[in-house]
Amino acid sequence: MVKYLFGHVTTESTSKTINVVASSKTKLVGENQGIPNSPQKTIALTAAVGKMVYLDIEVDNEIFRCLGTVTDIKTHNLMMTSQMESVGAKETAGALPKGEDFRKLTFSIQATFNRPPGETKWKKYSSALPTSPETRTAVYFLDDETVQEMVDEDDIYPTVGFFRGLDTAPQPLAIPDFGGNTGATHSAVIGRSGSGKTATYTYILGTYMCHEHHAIMVIDPQGQWSNENGMVMSLQGMAESLGRPVSVLRVAEDIKLPMDEEIFSRMVSKLNLWKKFRRMGTENLEAFSDAVASGIANLPYSEYDKPPRDLLSKVFGSIANSSSALNRIYTRGDRQDAFRDDLLRLAGLPIIDPDTGEQALVSKEDEEEVEKNWEAILSVFSPLINLFSSTNIDGGKRHSLGGSYGFLKDVFQVRNANSGPAPYVILDMSPSTKIHAAADLMGGKDAGLNMQKILDNQDVKALILMMVLDEMKRASETAFATTNTGNLNTQIVFDEAWRFAPEGKATPEIEELAKKLEGFALDTRKFGIGWSYILQSPADLKTGIWRQLTYVYVGYGLVGDDVKRLEALTDDVKQLDLYRQFIPPKSTGIYPFMLMGPVSPIIFTTAPAFVNVFNNNQDYLHYNSSWINKITERRSMPRITVEKLDPNRRVKTPKQKAVQVEKQYSVGNAKTVSTPQTTIKEPVVSKKIIDDDPDLVEDMPF
């Protein structure tokens, strides 16, 4: 075994901190170091800061091995006394005696293993040595072979990159499984744009798949995880290749939202649905939105599948004929009467003169005004009510999240040894590619193609997320209550968390969602549901959530107060000096990350681990091949290739598709329907579409 000698223990070392003196010019490489007459040679001194080192000592016939990280190093020279330095300030450097440089440092012990006499396996011992080491004890650089000695070969330790400064030694990770009695843990990945945080967490999520019963659900506000555009690796391809069910659920197309009267009313108000119908005060508008939401919520769900104009006409007529509803909107008689007449015109109902009892005549100008109002209202209401209907705007089927037949029943389950692999699910909150393309072609004017405007509204998206989270909470509580055999073992990843779970002032909808997320993190952990948040700064995350985090993965770019906030997560703040030395990945192509929390099996303290994240899928597959191949072999599946993890191979070419676009033109109560043919380019963006068009895909991973 080759060891790379770094230096030797010097005086004043303790059982917790080791003082080391290293040569300033060379280091020794020896075969069987420590054995007399073993071969040795010298090589050039290499960088030391940021690398892990170790030493062995013998106590009571047992071998103890401690490990630590070099955080800084200082140069010394016994000839360079303060007096000589003063002389050197006035004379040339050549006039000074050279002496001999040496380097000195102190590192804190982060883990200690022991090996009893006669045994070959190392055991975890403590975060300190049983005694201080002798001076001149050799200190070596950590290498891959030594790491493999330390970890139990029976345990699964995936990896996402190399030890910092050791490009041949992968950093093993103790990836937690949430199926035990301890419950789940929460985590966050943080870094500025370009730090590689999405790529890093893509690899981390891939390593979680070593636990076959660990379900993963990604809440995807922008559609990045569903379409995998710009991703370093296809997690969908990874999951499929490991035998996991994969689902991409798009709010715009696939999910039928549960009707919530209060939230629907707030959506209507946020979308300013009535702005072209009538000028109304804020309180009047809110009361009207409440009345409409109440009317819709009290209708059977089957009504939501009817033409939006028919549905809303029925609600308008009900409000117009309800004195109590009108009184809540307007108290003044003249305004109330005028408002009632406007509703009756929109509903296509007769207006009766209270004095004569005769039906008021409807002029051509009135009819034209009604149609203009309907066009403005339906441009917003049609896509909004479609989120609650059984079919999407393209005629595809929507399904509920909750209930016995909802999507979530396959996510929140207590799994056992006989269960199949847990699913990988992406909940896409963005407008779908189809809807974007069609809306662009139609100039955004068609009422059925304005879903983009709704789902691009951050406050409306927050309201939708509230409904989704409530469904998730109900489904998880039901699943957990129906069994006493274990936890739900699920991880929920929340991308763009800084938008929806911020600390500080935001819109009422965002603040309410953030508070709800804080409560869910606390309540669902005991069910075995862990949350992971992707954001740019620790200050962007609500404090109540931040305090619940067990793991924090930090990429390049944090400064000032953000770094100070990280100090509370470790008892060795000197380690953060290594983080401050990170350089922009854009300039090097290397993505350094600091992993905080009990993530490394060879660190027993709160000190972070440092890793250079893989920048290619070939390395990821190679260094994770042990656990990946065990799964594929057990399930009689082919081995995973680099090509199967390429996110850019999922689509062969854009597809030309004829889309039926229905426009309705109304004159009075008569309607004329025309169905022009429109051709749009539509990328294949979901498994549903791929199933319909198998010729579009070559060598797909599912």
Can you name each region flagged by the protein language model?
Residues M79-M80, W225-G230, L257-P258, F500-P502, ...:
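Switch/connector loops and helix/strand junctions flanking conserved nucleotide-binding motifs
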Residues I219, G223-S234, E261-G519, K526, ...:
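P-loop NTPase motor domains
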Residues T159-E253, R565-D572, S625-R635, K644:
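Glycine-rich phosphate-binding loop of nucleotide-binding enzymes
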Residues M1-G191, T200, I204, G486-L488, ...:
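Basic- and hydrophobic-enriched, low-structure N-terminal and domain-boundary segments
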Residues K515-T605:
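Conserved ATP-driven motor cores of ASCE-family P-loop NTPases powering translocation/secretion/packaging/pilus
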Residues F113, Q222-S226, P431-K434, W498-R499, ...:
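Conserved nucleotide-binding/hydrolysis micro-motifs of P-loop NTPases
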Residues N181-T182, Y208-H211, N418-S419, A481-G486, ...:
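Conserved catalytic network of the ASCE P-loop NTPase/AAA+ motor domain
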Residues T588-F702:
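Conserved P-loop NTPase motor module
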